[in-house]
Amino acid sequence: MKGTYREISILLPAYNNVCVPLVEELQRQAALLPGLQYEILVADDGSTCQEAIHQNRLIGQWPCCRYIERKQNTGRSAIRNFLAREARYGRMLFVDSDLHVCSPSFLKDYLEAEGDVVVGGILKGGDASRLASNLRYRYETDYQRKHDFSHRQQAEDKDFSAASFLATKQVMTICPFDENFKGYGYEDVLLGKSFSLHGFRIVHINNPLLMDKYEDNDTYLQKTQEACRTLYVFRTELRGYSKLISWQEKLQKHPWLYGLLRKSFPWASPWMRKWLTGNHPSVTLFNAYKLLYYIHLHEKDEAI
């Protein structure tokens, strides 16, 4: 896929968030590129927030924009596949609708990039002092230091993120999102693996979108547990693409320690949750919580 200014479909899945400013900026940048044929499609995936739906309807009144309301929530994979089918043009830019453009050349930089799949990355931001007690902010900023642009280039398929990436319609037809993923998490990890298995080159560029909104600690812990359950269901497919799986398999080789850890989550989790939802959440403790919960899922399954 060679860089070109000819055409692009910009695809945004939306759920319970207002993305009017994001679409406005994407449209502004697209309109400034000479000769570019473009469309911006926003698909609402059965949102329950009527205020978000009401505000986002404005998008449908803008040139080259469509706002599609879906009555039923179909999940993160299915809504993206729906957008890919609806897209008019051969090159498609997927953008999560809760992010922000932080570069005036964001769209231009994507269009000039070459590769079967191009990933721009995510920059974590926000007021550090105000967010000091936010678990996700702490985790994401710590994660960012270990997965910056240079690190992403070294592990192309294993550092794939669906929050912002460019691909052709042909690539997405061969490698669609797996719609068996109904819950939160890991659908993009498996997609990155699928790209690699089919021989598609994943190119990472330094063209991030900004993430600066973070859910409260309790909500994030609930989402984390949902992601762990998703990982457990698809553990065979995701082997080699998750550190949780790797750690669980390593610990399993030490029966005494593993047996202790398998039974520790029920009594350890209450005080861990209290600490993680408090004013001084620890990333180290959070990682331990995830591992214990993931191991606990094996214990529950084996007890049936």
Whereabouts are the PLM-identified features?
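Active-site donor/metal-binding and catalytic loop motifs
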Residues: 201-235
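Acidic donor-binding loop at a coil-to-helix junction in glycosyltransferase catalytic cores
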Residues: 183-191
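Acidic donor-binding segment of Leloir-type glycosyltransferases
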Residues: 26-69
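Short aromatic/hydrophobic "clamp" motif used to bind/position activated sugar donors
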Residues: 92
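Conserved donor NDP-sugar-binding/catalytic core segment of glycosyltransferases
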Residues: 104-135
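Glycine-rich, basic loop-to-helix element that forms the pyrophosphate-binding segment
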Residues: 70-87
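Non-catalytic, C-terminal membrane-associated alpha-helical segments of glycosyltransferases
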Residues: 226, 243-304
